[in-house]
């Protein structure tokens, strides 16, 4: 059961990774006024809570990339897991002169821990989560400084988790579809708050299939 929690929960780390590589198509700030953004993200599901922070660099259109570090805690397991996340995307108009953007891209999360005492030994968990997909979004101005940034996304996700104890190891894998959506609230030209929800389809039984997220992004001045 505990091993299943690890496999099902680490997919939430993908949210922290994607928050470190966001664009308008993902409900976040454009790189028009600043090429460097700092971000923080929180992701919650039935069995886990994950949070992290990182930085992104990119262009208004074209390539953008980022990295982050996150920490996860799990129900029923002592200790925390640390994850190193990265992502890469490409932003482009949905069609010529359209205000909508589409961004194909992917993320990779490497998880380390937690460790559990089992009998006279220590069981060490590790995980790898990868996503490949695309997102679509736009900016809707409300006032001179405030905009709403609605977005939707779809991605394929794959998680591999390993448990090692006394020289023996066991591995489990899971592949699934991630359907996401939400809206960023651009409160100032350099600050966005972004609530989101991600649903997993086709995952193994017992997997957390609903993940709630909240992220904040701040654009560094030139």
Regions found by a protein language model. Give the residues of each.
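Hydrophobic, lipid-facing positions within transmembrane beta-strands of outer-membrane proteins
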Residues: 36-40, 49-53, 63, 82-86, ...
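Bacterial N-terminal signal peptides that target proteins for export
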Residues: 1-8
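Outer-membrane beta-barrel transmembrane domain signature
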Residues: 92, 110-222
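Short glycine/proline- and aromatic-enriched beta-strand/turn motifs that initiate or cap beta-hairpins
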Residues: 20-75, 222
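Strand-connecting loop/turn motifs
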Residues: 33-37, 60-64, 95-101, 143-147, ...
């Amino acid at each position: 059961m505990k091993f299943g929690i690890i496999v099902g929960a680490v997919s939430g780390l993908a949210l922290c990774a994607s928050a470190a590589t966001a664009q308008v198509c993902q409900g976040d700030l454009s790189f028009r006024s600043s090429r460097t953004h700092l971000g923080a993200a929180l992701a919650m599901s039935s069995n886990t809570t994950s949070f992290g922070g990182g930085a992104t660099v990119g262009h208004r259109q074209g390539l953008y990339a980022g990295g982050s570090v996150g920490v996860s805690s799990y129900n029923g397991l002592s200790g925390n897991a640390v994850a190193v996340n990265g992502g890469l995307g490409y932003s482009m108009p949905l069609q010529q002169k359209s205000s909508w953007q589409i961004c194909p891209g992917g993320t990779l999360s490497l998880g380390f821990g937690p460790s559990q005492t089992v009998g006279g030994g220590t069981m060490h968990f590790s995980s790898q989560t990868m996503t490949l997909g695309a997102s679509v979004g736009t900016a809707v101005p409300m006032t001179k400084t405030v905009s709403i940034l609605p977005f939707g996304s779809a991605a394929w996700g794959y998680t591999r988790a390993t448990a090692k104890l006394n020289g023996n190891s066991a591995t489990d894998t899971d592949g699934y579809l991630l359907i996401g959506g939400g809206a960023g609230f651009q409160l100032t030209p350099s600050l966005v708050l972004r609530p989101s929800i991600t649903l997993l389809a086709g995952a193994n039984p017992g997997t957390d299939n609903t993940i709630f997220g909240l992220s904040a992004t701040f654009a560094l001045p030139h």
